[in-house]
Amino acid sequence: TQVNNIFFGSTISNDGFPKDEFDFMLSNPPFGTSWKAELKAWGDIKKDEITDSRFLIEYDGNPEYSLIPDIGDPQMLFLANNISKMKRSTDLGSRIIEVHNSSSISTGGAGSGTSNLRRFIIENDLLEAIVALPQNMFYNTGISTYLWIVTNKKEDKRKGYIQLIDASELKASLRKNVGEKNCEITPKIRRQIIDLYLAYKDADSKYSMVFKNEEFGYYSATVNRPLRLKVEVSTDRIELLRNQLKDEGVVEVLNKYCEDQGDAISYDFNDFMEHITHISAKCGVKLTAKRKKLIRDFFSAVDEKGSIVLDAKGQPELDKNLKDTEKIPLLYESGIDGYWENEIRPYLPDSWIDKESAVIGYELRFMKYF
């Protein structure tokens, strides 16, 4: 009987249908509530100790690709659960409709569990459409909500594309509020939304737009800037070094430097260190890595007027305080290199993008399009 298909407990930590697949799956998961209780139910484990194959999958060469969201919001766990139960060997496959708030479509940076699930869904061409619903549709919250329409058997014309439908203003007011709920979607409005969906690329662009899957993807990459240092050596600072650290070898080398240069300010750290290395060799003082760091920390300071500091291989050292992250669209013409050339270099000509840091992320920001 149907009642035997109802299981007590949490869908997340106690899967009542571990081997079943379904034609249709509807879900209205909780918004923005902690799911710490699930960790306790799993055996009082930590988030990074989850091994459930619904939420930790093999993808993109990673045997432990995580679809696990932040502990404060379980919505994407419910979506991942349903995706794991899609029929893959039938002509019609499966269809999922879920109601989510805005966090599931846009929060979570590249590489996070939430973004990873969006990436998995979109790169596997499972996302057919997202429908923005009116605000104040629910009794206990006025927040914006969205329908995810997911299927593994798209029509040919929809393959490789995602439809965004903005139905946020398609609503009828209630004569009397019911909690936060002050509007509804009538059968007539429901028909209007369905017609927008069916019209697909021919739908009114005020309410519906269609994009390639890659439109919503981006590289999150680190933009580095070089370290620039000013060096200031004086007899007073050398004496301060002597009193604090009592390294007579370094003091001897620095005193020789002052004899040659006087109390001096240099904006070329590499030239300064070459001079120090030459003096230390003449004095028979071994310039260890520890002593080099001591001199650098004690006598140099970041200064944008300084020359670029080079490492032992002659490559620019990065200034960690100037490190930034840039989102580069997957569809940007000429890719990461072109983005740096056109969008970053004109303003930061000494910068460079660390390509090894690039991580693919996906987000669906309705406000960008409507």
Kindly give the residue locations of the regions a language model identified.
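A conserved structural/catalytic subdomain of Rossmann-like adenosyl-cofactor enzymes
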Residues: 13-15, 19-370
